[in-house]
Structure formats: structure tokens, C-alpha cells
Amino acid sequence: MLTAIRKNGLILAVFACVSTGLVALTYALTAEQIQQQEQKQLLQVLNQVIPHKYHDNPLAQACTLVNDDKLGTAKPMHAYLAQRDGQPTAIAIETIAPDGYNGEIKLIVGIANNGTVLGVRVLAHQETPGLGDKIDLRISNWVLGFNGQQVTADNQDDWKVRKDGGQFDQFTGATITPRAVVLAVKKAVEYVNQHQQQLHNQPNPCEGQ
């Protein structure tokens, strides 16, 4: 009886070791593939918010981490630093709209050195399908309305949805979501405008973050 129990225990132990080994092997074989896919997706987004003509450096690697209340979170946000012929040209910065209808909305905003918005994309959100999800370019082209915009002392009131007297469309039945995104983009542009030189001079510690 005792021998049988020991035998069964040994079999289970061997099975557990083999299973663990297979899981580890599978992870090792797929980790690089997953990393390559994530890098590919990151590059696609970066090239949407900072067009190719603005950079000839490896944008995904030219990254620094920043903390500021204007970015909507206490967590470090990634900023990607574009250069052309060795000269700074633009910055793509992550930011959070903390007051979306269903929670935080994570964005990335591309901003040229003259303060012009080059592109905005939604990285993550939980907004209501058919209503607030129109911030996603896969659903509507609303987010393209930021292209070419600037934030200046004279146009502060324009950076609101139309319902609040601004220039950006709200969605039928969903004003909270676009209002949150407009404010988050505005603050991100203001942050970059104020810290542009500092950002371009920061080291690039993002690898593995």
C-alpha cells in the first residue's frame, strides 16, 4: 500500500516537472515572437502619430519616461523622440484621460516641434460600444480632427466640445467621452510645448518598460 502511494506520488511529481518544463519551453519559444509582434504594433502606431517625413531615427528605441499631472496619471508615461538628420522634430507622448465615461482612456499624441498636433490614437479604453467608442479610429474618424491643431493662449476656448462652446464634435448620446479626450490631448500638447527641449535631452531608459 505504502509502496503504491510512493509510486503514484513519484509519477505525479514527474508529470508536474514535465508539464512545467513544457510550459517554460513554450514560453521561451513564443516570447520572442510576442515581443516582435508588440514592437511591430508599436511602430505602426508611432508612424501614424509621427509620419515618416518627421523622423529617420529608430523611433521605438528613442524613448524616455516622464511623470506629470498634466498627463492624467501618477504613473510614468512613454515619450518617443523623433529626429531627422540628427535634429529634433517631434514627440509622441502617452497620456491618460482619467475621466472617460467608463474609466481611463489611454492615448498617444504626436506633436511637432512647432506645437502642431500630428496625430492622436487611442491605445486603450472601455467606452460604450456604439457611443463613446467612436474615439477609436477603427470605429470613426473623429480622432483625426486633432490633426493640424495647436494650443495657444488665444484658442483655449476652442479646445472643448461644441456643446461647451468649443470646436470639437461630441457624439450623440455621449458627450463625456469626447470631452475627456479633448482635454487630455490639450494638456498633453501643453506639457510637450513647455518641456520640449528637456524631453529631447533626456536619456532613453524605456527598454524593457
Swiss-Prot record:
Cofactor(s) it depends on: FMN
Protein's cellular compartments: Cell inner membrane
Subcellular location, principal: membrane
Matches recorded under SMART domains: FMN_bind (SM00900)
Residues with the FMN phosphoryl threonine modification: T175
Record's GO cellular component terms: plasma membrane
Record function comment: Part of a membrane-bound complex that couples electron transfer with translocation of ions across the membrane.
Protein name: Ion-translocating oxidoreductase complex subunit G
Organism: Vibrio cholerae serotype O1 (strain ATCC 39541 / Classical Ogawa 395 / O395)
Phylogenetic lineage: Bacteria, Pseudomonadati, Pseudomonadota, Gammaproteobacteria, Vibrionales
Encoding gene per record: rnfG
